[in-house]
């Protein structure tokens, strides 16, 4: 009981009933068909409304929003769109097991950055400086981090953001 599993994301609780009830309701209504590959139109529209309200950003839900089944699929699709053969991708470690293979499948070169427990597994500007090259194109910044649960605060992220802007 005192062991915390750091394995693949299996919750240690049952799915709440309000979620189960909605699934049952949806099945009873006959909504058992595939959605569009880009995601439900209504969800894409709601995402654009949220982005407008929260961040004053405007996107076309029909052409600029893609709903994936999870974060890993989204990262995979983004890497395949951005990488050219030989481009390097910085991946802080430990990290979710799929990031490195996604880079390899997109013809990129994964470069791992071993995060330090003394920094609570938070990425630092110094660690970026030690790993960036002229081939670096992408930084995977997966926080909150799986499997450590590490979270980067705004104060942690600001120097990283400055570094990224400096190295475009």
At which residue positions do the language-model features occur?
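Short glycine-rich anion-binding loops that position phosphate/pyrophosphate groups of nucleotides
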Residues: 11, 72, 96, 143-147
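Conserved PLP-anchoring active-site segment centered on the Schiff-base-forming lysine
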Residues: 81-103
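Active-site phosphate-binding strand-loop segment of PLP-dependent enzymes
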Residues: 111, 115-168
């Amino acid at each position: 009981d005192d062991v915390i599993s750091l394995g693949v994301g299996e919750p240690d609780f049952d799915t709440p009933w309000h979620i189960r009830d909605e699934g049952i309701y949806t099945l009873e209504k006959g909504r058992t068909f595939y959605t569009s590959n880009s995601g439900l139109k209504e969800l894409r529209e709601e995402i654009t409304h949220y982005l407008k309200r929260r961040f004053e950003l405007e996107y076309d839900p029909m052409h600029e929003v893609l709903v994936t089944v999870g974060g890993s699929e989204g990262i995979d699709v983004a890497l395949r769109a951005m990488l050219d053969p030989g481009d390097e991708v910085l991946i802080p470690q430990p990290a979710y097991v799929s990031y490195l293979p996604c880079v390899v499948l997109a013809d990129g070169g994964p470069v791992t950055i071993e995060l330090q427990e003394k920094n609570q597994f938070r990425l630092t500007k110094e660690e970026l400086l030690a790993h960036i090259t002229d081939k670096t194109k992408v930084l995977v910044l997966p926080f909150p981090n799986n499997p450590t649960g590490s979270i980067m605060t705004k104060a942690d992220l600001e120097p990283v953001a400055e570094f990224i802007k400096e190295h475009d």
